[in-house]
UniProtKB/Swiss-Prot annotation:
InterPro entries: PyrdxlP-dep_Trfase, PyrdxlP-dep_Trfase_major, PyrdxlP-dep_Trfase_small, Ser_HO-MeTrfase, Ser_HO-MeTrfase-like, Ser_HO-MeTrfase_PLP_BS, SHMT-like_dom. Catalyzes the reversible interconversion of serine and glycine with tetrahydrofolate (THF) serving as the one-carbon carrier. This reaction serves as the major source of one-carbon groups required for the biosynthesis of purines, thymidylate, methionine, and other important biomolecules. Also exhibits THF-independent aldolase activity toward beta-hydroxyamino acids, producing glycine and aldehydes, via a retro-aldol mechanism. One of its GO terms (biological process) is tetrahydrofolate interconversion. CDD domains: SHMT. PANTHER family: SERINE HYDROXYMETHYLTRANSFERASE. Pathway: One-carbon metabolism; tetrahydrofolate interconversion; Amino-acid biosynthesis; glycine biosynthesis; glycine from L-serine: step 1/1. Homodimer. Its EC number is 2.1.2.1. The keyword Cytoplasm applies. Keywords: Amino-acid biosynthesis, Cytoplasm, One-carbon metabolism, Pyridoxal phosphate, Transferase. This is Serine hydroxymethyltransferase. The modification N6-(pyridoxal phosphate)lysine is found at K226.
């Protein structure tokens, strides 16, 4: 197949092929990454990238938006059907942009946010001091108990003490389900709004493999990639008409200018894929594969945060190990397994070193790997960690896993 890019920029073309080779030969186990649908990539590479469309369908500031109005309207309707809600904004460029737009819509400067502590699994946009949310608003955090589960009683006490305007329930590294009903009870107790950030578990939510944030949350944000397997982007959902109007204004003109119409089209394509029966089977596989992996690691006496997992990810705990999350990340990377170092509850090391790693099952499940492969992977992870400085072992495992990976090709071509 001939590519224009090969003729116009051979350097980038060759690097894309290099990454294509890496994605095919390595085991991608970063919990926030996934392999999107080829149809999604086709939409993203379309002529829609040429069109500016500031505003919303039938309320644009530019002409020539007749077609993109239809595309965005289709994306909105599919999102509403997928998440069973009344209002959807599909313009957010990312999950962080979606969260910031929610705050911009519903809060005043220096209002109070209560979100999950970063070391317990929260996200930067849930009030971390280094984030805009930690600078523009007063941020407070709740955490987990000694068992690694969210401490709802502590969260209630903190909420009663600080009286936040908004409570955020969601995570980037928490291996258990969120109890949205309990969080709503806490929010109602203190008169707060409830934002459900389901960026990580959206694909499980829409297939009934995780509790649904509605009707408990006033507003819901998510990314469209991760477990949804759509394009990189964000969405905001609600059943409240007044909140929906504020959200729309907060996205445009509040925090963004022109929407990315090629990405919005890709979101629509992804939502259609998510509505298919095959996607339900995929979500079940994501969860069952993670259970197999957790079991394999526990049988080898590896410590997991909360003792296991109820979703698509797990956290390994190295607090009592001589090696760090960074060490494990590097060693596993050398063996062809891509994970990420991650802070964990009770963290004693810096965020650049950490005492844990986060592992996800979404990407390898998308390749069609199942219980057999995940048991093998669990055993190989254990072998590497138990002899973490053995470089020759790492290289040997890399070749073994490369052979397995080649049985489950990601794509037939790198550019769509």
């Amino acid at each position: 197949m001939a590519y224009f890019l090969e003729q116009t920029d051979s350097e980038i073309f060759e690097l894309i092929f290099e990454e294509y080779k890496r994605q095919n030969e390595h085991l991608e186990m970063i919990a926030s990454e996934n392999y999107t649908f080829p149809s999604v990539m086709e939409a993203m590479g379309s002529i829609l990238t040429n069109k500016y469309a500031e505003g919303y369908p039938n309320k644009r500031y530019y002409g020539g938006c007749e077609v993109v109005d239809k595309i965005e309207s289709l994306a909105i309707e599919r999102a509403k059907k997928l998440f069973n809600c009344q209002f959807a904004n599909v313009q957010a460029h990312s999950g962080s942009q979606a969260n910031n737009a929610v705050y911009h819509a519903l809060l005043k400067p220096y209002d109070k946010i209560l979100g999950m502590d970063l070391s317990c699994g929260g996200h930067l946009t849930h009030g971390a001091k280094v984030s805009l949310t930690g600078k523009h608003y007063q941020s407070f955090s709740y955490g987990v108990n000694l068992d690694g589960y969210i401490d709802y009683e502590e969260a209630l006490k903190i909420a009663q003490s600080v009286k936040p305007e908004i409570i955020v329930c969601g995570f980037s590294a928490y291996p258990r389900e969120i109890d949205f009903k309990k969080f709503r009870e806490i929010a109602d107790e203190v008169g707060a709004l409830l934002l459900g950030d389901i960026a990580h578990v959206a694909g499980l939510v829409v297939t009934n493999e995780h509790a649904h944030p509605f009707p408990h949350c006033h507003v819901v944000s998510s990314t469209t990639h991760k477990t949804l397997r759509g394009p990189r982007g964000g969405i905001i959902l609600t059943n409240d008409e007044e909140i929906a109007a504020k959200i729309d204004k907060a996205i445009f003109p509040g925090t963004q200018g022109g929407p990315l119409m090629h990405v919005i089209a890709a979101k629509a394509v992804g939502f259609k894929e998510n509505l298919k029966p095959e996607f339900k089977a995929y979500a079940k596989l994501v969860k069952s594969n993670m259970q197999v992996l957790a079991k394999a690691l526990k049988e080898k006496n590896h410590k997991l945060v909360s003792g296991g997992t109820s979703n698509h990810l797990l956290l390994m705990d190295f607090l009592d190990k001589p090696y760090s999350g960074k060490d494990a990340d590097i060693a596993l990377g050398n063996a062809g397994i891509t994970v990420n170092k991650n802070t964990i509850p009770g963290e004693t090391r810096s965020p650049f070193v950490t005492s844990g790693i986060r592992i996800g099952s979404a990407a390898l499940s998308a390749r069609g790997m199942g219980a057999k492969e995940f048991e093998i992977i669990g055993n190989k992870i254990s072998d590497i960690l138990n002899d973490i400085n053995n470089v020759s072992l790492q290289l040997h495992v890399k070749e073994e896993l490369k052979a397995m990976a080649n049985q489950f090709p990601v794509y037939q071509q790198p550019i769509f």
